[in-house]
Amino acid sequence: DIAFRGGMIKYILDHDLYFKDYVLSYTNAAFLVNPKFSFNDGLFSGYDAQKHAYDKSSWSFQKDGKGLIKRDDTLKNPHCVFQLMKKHYDRYDLKKVSSITGTPEADLLAVYKAFAATGKPDKAGTIMYALGQCHHSVAVQNIRTMTIVQLLLGNIGICGGGINALRGEPNVQGSTDHALL
């Protein structure tokens, strides 16, 4: 699941299919991260192996003299959230995603193209998921990758967009709200 959506994120970023005005206005993509922050080998900066704890002082944004977060609205600064995200998702090329998911590269590309086409002011795309996404040890990351896709495409807060959890017996309302029953 994470590899599949990681590949979609890479595809959106590599082909400039993100909704730039939306991304600049409604996300932290332009925010400049502390240059001391890092993420290597699955560990964030500040990890103390002896204490098994983090010093989180590098986990911050750069601020100006007034205490406001610095921005790079060109999204080119290597310390902006957008560039750090690009670097992180660069590993999810079609070949790797195909080998992890078992999905042929051509099929991945077809899905990525179709869904990325919703990243325009006159389009919308929704992601619907069921309990399976939540019943993994990486459930938070599953939902987070859905959120990143939808924020990049501007599909949050618009009619026909969003991320919608469908539930079974505990709450059938979600299914009926979406006219699926």
What are these regions (language model features)?
Residues 1-118:
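Long, well-ordered, tryptophan-enriched scaffold segments
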Residues 89, 106-107, 111, 115-181:
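A glycine-rich, hydrophobic/aromatic-adjacent loop/helix-cap motif
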